[in-house]
Structure formats: structure tokens, C-alpha cells
């Protein structure tokens, strides 16, 4: 059984955002605007994406 994955792209700048939101974006493996990270689809990752949903876009 293969692991399900989710691709996340940073679409907004981190300037002016809360420190814990910046840390969450870094935890998702995103550095620059338009950077893409492919992560395992787990409840923890889903929660991180939900927390910073105004900064990121889910691609797949």
C-alpha cells in the first residue's frame, strides 16, 4: 500500500504574519513564494495546512 501524499505551494509572503504561522510554513518545508513541497497526507500535516490556509495552496 503506497502512502498518500499532498503537494503544497506557498502563494503569499510571510511578511507581517504571526511567528507561529511562519514556523508552521517552515515545518511544511516551504521557503520562498511559489516553492512546492510534497508531504505525506497525515492528520498532523492537514492541521498545519489548515492553520496557514491563507498562505498556501494545495495542488494535489
From Swiss-Prot:
Gene3D superfamilies: Ribosomal protein L30, ferredoxin-like fold domain. Part of the 50S ribosomal subunit. Coiled coil: none annotated. GO terms for cellular component: cytosolic large ribosomal subunit. Keywords: Ribonucleoprotein, Ribosomal protein. Pfam families: Ribosomal_L30. The lineage of its organism: Bacteria, Pseudomonadati, Pseudomonadota, Betaproteobacteria, Burkholderiales. It comes from Cupriavidus necator (strain ATCC 17699 / DSM 428 / KCTC 22496 / NCIMB 10442 / H16 / Stanier 337). It comes from the Bacteria. Signal peptide: none annotated. Belongs to the universal ribosomal protein uL30 family. GO terms for biological process: translation. This is Large ribosomal subunit protein uL30. One of its GO terms (molecular function) is structural constituent of ribosome.
